[in-house]
UniProtKB/Swiss-Prot annotation:
It holds the Pfam family Rieske. This is Carbazole 1,9a-dioxygenase, terminal oxygenase component CarAa. It comes from Metapseudomonas resinovorans. PANTHER family: BLR4922 PROTEIN, IRON-SULFUR DOMAIN CONTAINING PROTEIN. Binds 1 [2Fe-2S] cluster per subunit. Keywords: 2Fe-2S, Dioxygenase, Iron, Iron-sulfur, Metal-binding, NAD, NADP, Oxidoreductase, Plasmid. CDD domains: RHO_alpha_C_DMO-like (cd08878), Rieske_RO_Alpha_OMO_CARDO (cd03548). [2Fe-2S] cluster binds at C69, H71, C90, H93. SUPFAM superfamilies: Bet v1-like, ISP domain. Its EC number is 1.14.12.22. Its cofactor is [2Fe-2S] cluster.
Length: 384
């Protein structure tokens, strides 16, 4: 059953599956927290694509269970009871499940029940990489993590640091905010632009051939699917904003050139290279929590050759790049997403919006996501 009214989906030309993906795409890896945020034997709760989950670290390894007892449907997290380190017991009737595989291994209140060994709670694969915790919300064996991460993120020398926060907008509004070529106008007064001496136009006018504004990648060696925004290369940067021929605003004429290489990848992760400095990259995920909220999983990467360089980068990240870039710059993006919420809340915004020439990158992303996603999350998955 569709997540969006069929009448609306029929009016969408070219990317109806994307419009239907209010809850995100199933069968993909998603980052949900940083490794340092989950300690041994201290289960964490979270919601991903509408599903309530529990994550626990046992002997260093992470496991993920669906946070709902099979007996009467209550959330195990209401009162977490782990009588042994390898199991979790429901606080209501003492059904007990193994973290490793979700099997109902015991019932404390009825140890001879025929249900023991016959029932199994849904589990999801978990993998840690670059200090981040990824969950594969899907069915069957997961693909390599590289398929769902941007190029360079997993490079051996790439040191990744970041922050994660919950934003009150649908994940698609976040993706399109990040990948929107002309949204840079909202950053014109950012502290990062001034204090880091960045060159930043007000926007871009498209060149002669709009087909050159994007490049689609659907044959990556590890299976990645993505779109490159090339308007910076094939368009005309606009540094003077005029009304009636009169210049009313100018862009920033800084010395540092950044954001030459911008791309978006399934299941919804942006790569900006270089950014926020010529020797760094930004990788940010827009992870669906439910139809109304998403995790804004922001990371900055910098190649580091040794421990000393990593330590220096950590200090620089906390003192400079986190407050100046991830907050001072990206906070503009957050309120822009939230400002779009009302227009798209009833899904009619997807057919009532009026796009213009520089939205070619957004159109290419919508088409790619519609064609190459690995499955649309539905309420049936959430309740199943």
């Amino acid at each position: 059953m569709a997540n969006v009214d069929e009448a609306i989906l029929k009016r969408v030309k070219g990317w109806a599956p994307y419009v239907d993906a209010k809850l995100g795409f199933r069968n993909h890896w998603y980052p949900v927290m940083f490794s340092k945020e989950i300690d041994e034997g201290e289960p964490k709760t979270l919601k991903l694509l509408g599903e309530n989950l529990l994550v626990n670290r046992i002997d260093g390894k992470l496991y993920c269970l669906k946070d709902r007892c099979l007996h009467r449907g209550v959330q195990l997290s209401v009162k977490v009871e782990c009588k042994t380190k390898s199991t979790i017991t429901c606080w209501y009737h003492a059904w007990t499940y193994r973290w490793e595989d979700g099997v109902l291994c015991d019932i404390l209140t009825n140890p001879t029940s025929a249900q023991i060994g016959r029932q199994k709670l849904k589990t999801y694969p978990v993998q840690e990489a670059k200090g981040c915790v990824f969950i594969y919300l899907g069915d069957g064996d997961p693909p390599p993590l590289a398929r769902d991460t941007p190029p360079n993120f997993l490079d051996d020398d790439m040191e990744i640091l970041g922050k994660n926060q919950i934003i009150k907008s649908n994940w698609r509004l976040a993706v399109e905010n990040g990948f929107d070529p002309s949204h840079i106008y909202i950053h014109k007064d950012s502290i990062l632009v001034k204090d880091n001496d960045l060159a930043l136009p007000l926007g871009f006018a498209p060149g002669g051939d709009r087909k050159q504004q994007t490049r689609v990648v659907d044959d990556d060696v590890v299976g990645r699917k993505g779109v490159y925004d090339l308007i910076g290369e094939h368009g005309v940067p606009v540094f003077e904003g005029t009304i009636g021929g009169e210049v009313v605003r100018e862009g920033a004429y800084g010395e540092k050139i950044v954001a030459n290489d911008i791309s978006i990848w399934l299941p919804g992760v942006l790569k900006v290279n270089p950014f926020p400095n010529p020797d760094m990259m930004q990788f940010e995920w827009y992870v669906p929590i439910d139809e109304n909220t998403h995790y804004y999983f922001q990371t900055l990467g910098k190649p580091c050759a040794n421990d000393e360089e990593r330590k220096n980068y950590e200090q620089e990240f906390e003192s400079k790049w986190k407050p100046m870039a991830l907050e001072g710059f990206n906070n503009d993006d957050i309120w822009a997403r939230e400002a779009m919420v009302d227009f798209y809340a009833d899904d009619k915004g997807w057919v009532n919006e009026i796009l213009f020439e520089v939205d070619e990158a957004i159109v290419a992303w919508r088409k790619l996501a519609s064609e190459h996603n690995q499955g649309i999350q539905t309420q049936a998955h959430v309740s199943g």
